[in-house]
């Protein structure tokens, strides 16, 4: 094996040429001699991505959340529950919820599609593979850390996670990025501390780390061997190809592909769940308490349902006021933001179905376990 890797890195290996070609990656017979000159034209692309990401996140996330933190500290509330409109008809519930939901997230959704497409044309693939390309704990951890500035909900993080996967990033790293965005959102943890108490926030942080890393690593194992073997990853890391297409042409094509594969199914799924919330979230009364009979169904409903960023906080605050026990409340705090049926469907073309089912089931289980822990400790 070392001799084979050495001969590959020296160039001219017919086996690796066919291997990389089958994966859709050009092979260079002499990596050292074909390295392009990385001048200003090369470095300005990742710099442009960082500028666009920083401006977009400041406008959509960082500035509004900074101001909302003071509101949460002063009033111990960040607004009314998005489910608190007493709809009884599924059709009216679908329309009413979709309107409120999309008004809350449309800016973040637009930014996510832009960033997910720009990621594929402005960031060199070998950079991404160095950081996130290999399956393992280190790559998964870096994927989770990479998510922290984003502060997106699961559906808005999905297009960026899809963009990462299309650049051949490992399953574990892409999943960690996707799940960590809503679960480990620093702003949400601060809001939760001011509104529900710092015990809830601490439990969410610890359980969130376990959820992000544990679920991602298990799903990585379920996914099996990556499409790119280690030798192919090494070759791509060492090689950088020159694309003859213009930036606008490449970005336009990538943007359309990402939009078409994620947004239509997203809108449809939100409408369906908006109608289904009539049955997913029953009217709360004091008899529900910490009953296990409600803990499990609410964990399942929370895993499937879709909400904007931090909306789980007023939802749980309202439900607890009406009599919901601590256990089911903690289960909702863990499952509602983590993933959702729409976000799972948005990623159907970028992850194996077994991986997505594994993520959904493990998220439900984590929610149930956290509910039991929360009922005992909080």
Residue ranges of model-derived segments:
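Alpha-helical transmembrane segments in multi-pass membrane proteins
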Residues: 108, 112, 116, 139, ...
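Intrinsically disordered, low-complexity non-transmembrane regions of multi-pass membrane transporters
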Residues: 23-51, 67-89, 224-254
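Transmembrane helical segments that form the transport core of multi-pass membrane transport proteins
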Residues: 95, 112, 122-132, 248-326
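Juxtamembrane and boundary regions of transmembrane helices in multi-pass small-molecule transporters
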Residues: 44-68, 130, 134, 139, ...
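Membrane-interfacial helix-loop connectors
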Residues: 147-205, 281-355
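Alpha-helical transmembrane segments of multipass membrane proteins
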Residues: 116, 120, 211-219, 273, ...
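Short, low-complexity intrinsically disordered segments enriched in A/P/G/S/L with frequent Arg
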Residues: 2, 12-13, 17
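Structural signal for alpha-helical transmembrane segments and their membrane-water exit/capping regions
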Residues: 49-89, 111-124, 220, 240-242, ...
